[in-house]
C-alpha cells in the first residue's frame, strides 16, 4: 500500500488546544496510524513543521513527538512550497494577519475558531482565500463528538417528530488562580485580548444549531462577569474585563417551523450533570439528552405522566425512563476526524463544507450576542453573503 506526504505549517501548537487536540491527538495520532486512509487505498502522511515564538518549547515538543522540523520564523516557513497547508491556533487577535500572510503565499488554510474578531474581517478572509484559489476550513469539532453525532442521527431519522425546543447547558468552575490553578489561560478573561465566553462559545453554538437543527435567525443574550478579579499564570492579580457567563436564546428555522433554543454557557458554574456539555431536545414524538459522548432518548410511549403534588415524596424515577442510544460504530477523536476530512479535501478535493464562510457565521452570532447584551433586545441574524465564494469541491 503506497502513499505520499503533505507538509503542514502548524502555528500555535504550544498553547492548550493547539498542543493537546491538534498536535497530539490529531496530527501525531494520524502519523502513528500510518497516515490518512485515502479512497484509492493509499495513505496520506502529514509532515508538520511546528512554528511559534518559544524555541525551547518547540524543540522539546518536536523531540517528544518525533517531529523533525520546527521554526520561530513564520515567514520562512510560509515561503516553503513543500508545505501546502497552514494551520493557525494562535490568539484570535493575531489570527487574521497570519491567515492573510498564508493566503499571500498560496497556502490552503485550516484554523481554530473564531476566525477573526469581527464578521466583516472574517468575510474578507473568506473572499481573499477564494480569490487566491486556496481551500479553507475552520475547526467545528463539536459536530463530530459522539454525543452530537448520535443526536444528529436521531434528527435525520425523524425520531423527534416536530422539534419544539433545544436546551443547552455548558460549563464548569474555572478556579480563580489563587488557591487553585486556573484551568484556562488568563487572556480568556480579558476582552482586550479577545477573551470572553460569548466570543468563544457562540461560535460553537452557531454551527451546532445550524447543522443539527436549523439556521439561527434571531438571538437574545444577557451575560455577566461573575468573577471580577482573577490571578494570572505568573501569580499576579488582574481585573477580568470579559464576560465569563452568557445566557442566550436563539430562534431557529426548523424544517417544520421555528425552534426555540436556549444555551447557558458559564465558567462560573459547578457541574451537576453527566458531562460538561448537555443538550436536551424535545419534540412531539420524543426527546433526547446528549453529552460529549453519550445520548439518551425517551419516546412518547415511554414518557411518564406526572402531576404536580409537592405534598408527597416523588413516586417517579425520571432518569430510569431514558434509554441509551447505541454507538453502532466507532467514534474517533472529533478534532482528528475533522483534520482527516480537511486533509482529504486538500489532497483529492473531497467535499468539505466547514469553510471560512461557515466560520464567519460563528463570529457573526458572537458579535450579535454581545450587541444584544449591550442593547438589551432581540436581534435578527441575517444571512451572510458568499460573494465570490467557490462551490465546495
Say what each PLM segment does.
Residues 69-81:
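Short acidic low-complexity segments
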Residues 41, 46, 345-362:
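Glycine- and charged-residue-rich phosphate/anionic-cofactor binding loop of Rossmann-like
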Residues 3, 134, 161-165, 371-393:
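C-terminal capping/lid region of NAD(P)-dependent oxidoreductase domains
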Residues 201, 206-302, 336-352, 367-369, ...:
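Contiguous beta-strand/loop segments that form the cofactor/metal-binding neighborhood of enzyme cores
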Residues 84-85, 91, 96-143, 158:
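Beta-strand-loop-alpha-helix segment that lines the small-molecule cofactor/substrate pocket
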Residues 1-65:
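N-terminal Rossmann-like dinucleotide-binding module
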Residues 142-240, 376:
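Predominantly a Rossmann-like dinucleotide-binding segment in NAD(P)-dependent oxidoreductases
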Residues 53, 328-339:
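Active-site loop of classical SDR/Rossmann-like NAD(P)-dependent oxidoreductases
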Amino acid at each position: 500500500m503506497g502513499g505520499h506526504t503533505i507538509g503542514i505549517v502548524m502555528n500555535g501548537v504550544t498553547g492548550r488546544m493547539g498542543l493537546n487536540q491538534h498536535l497530539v491527538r490529531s496530527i501525531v495520532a494520524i502519523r502513528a496510524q500510518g497516515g490518512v486512509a485515502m479512497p484509492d487505498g493509499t495513505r496520506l502522511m502529514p509532515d508538520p513543521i511546528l512554528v511559534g515564538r518559544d524555541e525551547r518549547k518547540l524543540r522539546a515538543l518536536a523531540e517528544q513527538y518525533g517531529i523533525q522540523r520546527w521554526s520561530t520564523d513564520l515567514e520562512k516557513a510560509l515561503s516553503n512550497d513543500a508545505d501546502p497547508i497552514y494551520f493557525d491556533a494562535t490568539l484570535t487577535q493575531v489570527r487574521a494577519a497570519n491567515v492573510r500572510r498564508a493566503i499571500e503565499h498560496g497556502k490552503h488554510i485550516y484554523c481554530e475558531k473564531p476566525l477573526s474578531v469581527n464578521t466583516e474581517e472574517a468575510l474578507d478572509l473568506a473572499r481573499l482565500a477564494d480569490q487566491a484559489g486556496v481551500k479553507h476550513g475552520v475547526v467545528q469539532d463539536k459536530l463530530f463528538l459522539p454525543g452530537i453525532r448520535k443526536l444528529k442521527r436521531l434528527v435525520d431519522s425523524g425520531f423527534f417528530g416536530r422539534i419544539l425546543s433545544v436546551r443547552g447547558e455548558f460549563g464548569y468552575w474555572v478556579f480563580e488562580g489563587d488557591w487553585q490553578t486556573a484551568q484556562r489561560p488568563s487572556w480568556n478573561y480579558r476582552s482586550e485580548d479577545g477573551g470572553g465566553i460569548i466570543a468563544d462559545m457562540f461560535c460553537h453554538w452557531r454551527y451546532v444549531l445550524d447543522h443539527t437543527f436549523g439556521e439561527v435567525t434571531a438571538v437574545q443574550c444577557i451575560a455577566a462577569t461573575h468573577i471580577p478579579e482573577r490571578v494570572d499564570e505568573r501569580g499576579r492579580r488582574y481585573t477580568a474585563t470579559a464576560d465569563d457567563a452568557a445566557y442566550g436564546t436563539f430562534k431557529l428555522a426548523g424544517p417544520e417551523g421555528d425552534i426555540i433554543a436556549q444555551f447557558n454557557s458559564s465558567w462560573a458554574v459547578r457541574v451537576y450533570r453527566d458531562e460538561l456539555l448537555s443538550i436536551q431536545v424535545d419534540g412531539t414524538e420524543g426527546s433526547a439528552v446528549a453529552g460529549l459522548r453519550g445520548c439518551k432518548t425517551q419516546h412518547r410511549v415511554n414518557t411518564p405522566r406526572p402531576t404536580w403534588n409537592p405534598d408527597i415524596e416523588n413516586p417517579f424515577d425520571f432518569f430510569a425512563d431514558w434509554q441509551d442510544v447505541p454507538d453502532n460504530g466507532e467514534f474517533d477523536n472529533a478534532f482528528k476526524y475533522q483534520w482527516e476530512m480537511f486533509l482529504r479535501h486538500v489532497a483529492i478535493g473531497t467535499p468539505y463544507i466547514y469553510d471560512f464562510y461557515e466560520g464567519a457565521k460563528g463570529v457573526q452570532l458572537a458579535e450579535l450576542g454581545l450587541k444584544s447584551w449591550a442593547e438589551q433586545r432581540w436581534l435578527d441574524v441575517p444571512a451572510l453573503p458568499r460573494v465570490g465564494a467557490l462551490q465546495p469541491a
